[in-house]
Amino acid sequence: MQIPFLDVGGDGPILHFAHPNAYPPECFRQFLAPLSEQYHVFAGIQRPLWANQKPEELADWQVLVDDMICLFEQQGWQNVIGVGHSLGAAVTMLTAVRHPEFFSKLALLDPVFLAPSLLQAAAQIPDAATQNPYVQGALNRRNLWTDKKAAFTHYRRKRVFNRWSDAALWDYVNNAIVPDGSGDVTLRYKREWEARFYSLLLQQGGAVWEALPDVRQPTLAVRALETDTLIPEGWQLWQELQPGATFIEAPDVSHLLIMERPLAMAQLVLDWLAEG
């Protein structure tokens, strides 16, 4: 099948954005718009957003790497600038290792590089991959509202969205929430998919540490100072495994940094790219 993608627009060299778990790429309008002023921006659409896909049939999260490889081969893309956030950053890195010709540079923003101690602890606990708070939080997430305004009001009260502007939150609501066919609205990226990726990453997340020493592209490595994903142990290990990368910690942001400060994060990427 043809892998779907979003054409954000713009002129210049191709830049591919890989979106995170649970967030469709259209949500990141404010982050992608400045990038499209200097680059032609595309964003692959991950399989949870395709029709007729079943999360319970997913056995390996790296199927997203296979999908990205397929997309690049179908479009004939090479020497692309790869930008990824969270799960999308991990997928971009692994794709770059398997097909170095696809990418000229990488910008990895708070990637899901789970620290070895977390992976080891999960391996020692029965049902850790299903009982983890992130997995349970995803499965218990509210997924039905009367309309988009009700969804916006619900999210506006949530502490996790405190730093999001109203415009950023509306970008999420308008692009991540869709009619359910019965008069209400629901999540476009199903919560079962979100939970499935959390579960598989706890079981299989060590793959990123094995691959990092093989990255050959110039890399911008960004960690949100208030992240709960890329903890200090993982950040230090990344620096040891890829010492040639540019490492930057972004202040006053959490894991959702490109929604909290989209323009500042876009400028950070643009400045690094401009340095050559």
Annotate the PLM regions:
Residues 209-253:
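Conserved loop-alpha-helix segment in the C-terminal half of the alpha/beta-hydrolase fold
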Residues 7-57:
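Conserved HGGG/HGGXW glycine-rich cap/lid loop of the alpha/beta-hydrolase fold
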Residues 16-20, 85, 223:
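The conserved beta1-alpha1 loop
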Residues 78-121:
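Conserved hydrolase catalytic core segment
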Residues 42-83, 122, 267:
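Active-site loop/oxyanion-hole signature of alpha/beta-hydrolase fold enzymes
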Residues 142-220:
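Alpha/beta-hydrolase
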Residues 259-271:
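Post-His helix in hydrolase/transferase enzymes
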Residues 250-262:
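Catalytic histidine-centered segment of alpha/beta-hydrolase-like enzymes
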